[in-house]
Every structure is written in C-alpha cells, then in structure tokens.
C-alpha cells in the first residue's frame, strides 16, 4: 500500500507535470493552435510478463487511480481472453496466470495436472473450440466432400452435414449453414470416419459414435497448455516435473 501510494505520488507530482510541460513546449515549437496532447498514468503493478508487443500480463494494484485491496490481473493479447478458446479453459488460464504471478513453479505444475484431470471429465461440448462457419458451400466438394486447403473447422462442418444426413439423424441435428456459430474438436485416429475432426452446432452428435474418439489430450494441449507454455517459457518454468541427473543423485 505504501509503495503504491509513493509511486502514485511520484507520477502526480513529478512525471505528469513534466510530461505536460514537455507537450506544451512541443506545441509552442510547432506553433500549434492548441495543446491537445494529454498523458495520464494507467497502471501500477508489482509484476509483469511480456511475451511480445501488446501481449502481456500485469499484476495490478492501482488502475487509473482506482486502488485494489487485492491485485487484479490485466491480460492483453493472451489466449485467456479470446472467444476462440473453450470457456472452461479461459477460466483455467486466468487462474493459472494468478499462480504465475504470486505462486511457485511447483504450485503451477500441480495446478496444470489438476486442470488436465478436470478437462478430461468434461463433455465434448465444453472442450470444443468455438468458431464461425464461413464459406461452407465454397469448400464443399461433391467428389471428395471438401476441397484441398479447407480450414479444419469447415472440414468438420462438412463432415457433420454429410454424416448426419447419411445416418438419417439430420431431423435431430440442424445442418450447418454459412455464418453459423459452431464448435469443433479433434478426433483420435483411426476411427470409422477416417477423419481427425468433427464440428457441430450445439449438441455433440452422439449417434455418430465419435464421442469416445475425442482427442482430449490434443484439445487440452491446444486450448490450455500451449497458451500457458508461452508464458512459462518467458520465466523459465516447466509445465511438468522432469527428472534430471541432479535430482537422481539428490
């Protein structure tokens, strides 16, 4: 609290007046009609991790003058806030980032394992990736079902439309149209469909007998582990415990 107050005072008393006077000097130098450049302090944080430009996590104690009793995460450009990430993973990722900011590597590894177990207990609908189906008809092929280079979620949509109709369950499951909000998930191979993806609108078509082939490991890796690993690599942490020669002799 004392450090945050001190930093806030430095900004108000020293930095902001200096920046303001510098902008006024610039305005006078270029003979501006009016000085419109204004800069205010944004966040005071005790920890931060940057993965790239405009991609970062901050442990914020004060945001634009609003003081917090407990630090709040500010997440910019990271997978956790993207709607293309499955909803349960967005929650898991935010909690993982809190551990990254205030916990230990062991606590992080334990949390990842807990998330892995929880993730595998969820139904396909909750672990699948949200997308929008665009150009379904464009990518559809009468000879090979889908054209070369077809995006994976559209390929899943075409396969869904084809097999729900062929299995005569299209009365229960609506056909995926252009612009439809859909979900897709990876499948383990081999399976009877000989494909590694299936899409659906809301309910997973269990009649296709593909739910047992959902690749939970790959889904977890792409939806949760890969985004976390980007952050962990920046601070030198691992996603799992590794046996080393040093630990063998300790």
Outline where the language-model segments fall:
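DNA-dependent DNA polymerase catalytic subunits
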Residues: 1-250
């Amino acid at each position: 609290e004392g450090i945050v107050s001190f930093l806030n005072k430095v900004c108000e008393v020293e930095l902001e007046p200096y920046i303001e006077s510098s902008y006024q000097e610039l305005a006078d130098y270029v003979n501006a009609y009016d000085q419109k450049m204004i800069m205010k302090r944004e966040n005071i944080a005790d920890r931060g991790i940057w993965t790239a430009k405009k991609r970062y996590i901050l442990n914020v104690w004060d945001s634009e003058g609003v003081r917090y009793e407990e630090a709040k995460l500010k997440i910019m450009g990271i997978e956790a806030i993207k709607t293309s990430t499955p909803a349960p993973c967005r929650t898991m990722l935010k909690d993982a980032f809190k551990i990254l900011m205030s916990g230990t590597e062991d606590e992080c590894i334990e949390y990842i394992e807990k998330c892995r177990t929880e993730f595998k207990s969820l139904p396909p609908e909750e672990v699948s990736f949200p997308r929008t189906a665009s150009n379904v008809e464009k990518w559809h092929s009468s000879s090979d079902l889908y054209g070369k280079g077809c995006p994976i979620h559209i390929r899943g949509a075409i396969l869904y439309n084809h097999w729900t109709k062929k299995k005569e369950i299209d009365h229960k499951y609506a056909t995926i149209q252009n612009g439809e909000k859909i979900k897709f998930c990876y499948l383990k191979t081999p399976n009877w469909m000989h494909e590694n993806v299936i899409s659906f609108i809301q309910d997973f078509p269990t009649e296709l007998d593909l739910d047992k082939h959902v690749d939970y490991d790959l889904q977890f890796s792409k939806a949760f582990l890969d985004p976390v690993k980007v952050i962990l690599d920046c601070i030198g942490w691992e996603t799992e415990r590794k046996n080393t020669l040093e630990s063998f002799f300790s």
